Amino acid sequence: MKVINHIKEIRTSKAITQVQMAEDLQITRQTINAIEKNKYNPSLELALKIAKYFNVPFEELFYLEEEE
């Protein structure tokens, strides 16, 4: 199974740049980019911080994609 996220969609709908989000969460823009491209899964702590940052339920940001 693969973890998929909706961070980019939510971030852009709120007109937040990767740079601004990275500064607010005290991580690098490259980390945000890698997470959005599903190349890196954030730690549980960071995933929860992102959900809190956007004020959305964790399940709205991340879900498991079933393999065929």
Please identify what each model-predicted range represents:
Residues 45-60:
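DNA major-groove recognition helix of helix-turn-helix/homeodomain DNA-binding modules
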